[in-house]
């Protein structure tokens, strides 16, 4: 994922927000406005109270999702099925070869509050594969 986001940064295919953004309502408001104007992903580099960035709308287009999975145009479902039948083990990373490692907690991840009635901040990414009933076009 990191390499893909870096590629989008290099190519200008991702919107970048450098200013500090509050994870309580403000980040969600910026995301909502940006999604009305474009399907490009968004990278927030300065989240109030966190040393970590937030990325949003990473899978906002079929083209980007297909690129991420290494699927050609119109072959997303075939590629997805192949990947599910033949999972690849994640690489083993040796700490000395990939920079600094330290103990971490999920609490360090920035968690957004989207709406006033949300019970608490949360991390989103619920995704499932379905076909549009009338056209049969697959979508996530």
Located regions from the model:
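Extended, highly charged
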Residues: 1-140
């Amino acid at each position: 994922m990191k390499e893909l986001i870096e590629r989008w940064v290099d190519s200008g295919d991702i919107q970048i927000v450098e200013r500090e953004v509050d994870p309580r309502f403000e980040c969600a408001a910026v995301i909502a406005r940006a999604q009305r104007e474009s399907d490009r992903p968004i990278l927030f580099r300065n989240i109030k109270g966190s040393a970590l960035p937030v990325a949003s709308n990473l899978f906002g287009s079929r083209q980007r999702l297909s690129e991420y999975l290494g699927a050609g145009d119109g072959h997303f479902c075939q590629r997805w099925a192949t990947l599910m039948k033949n999972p690849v083990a994640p690489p083993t990373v040796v700490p000395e070869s990939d920079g600094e490692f330290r103990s971490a907690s999920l609490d360090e991840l920035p968690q957004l509050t989207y709406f006033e009635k949300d019970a608490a901040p949360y991390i989103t990414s619920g995704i499932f594969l379905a076909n549009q009933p009338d056209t049969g076009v697959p979508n996530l």
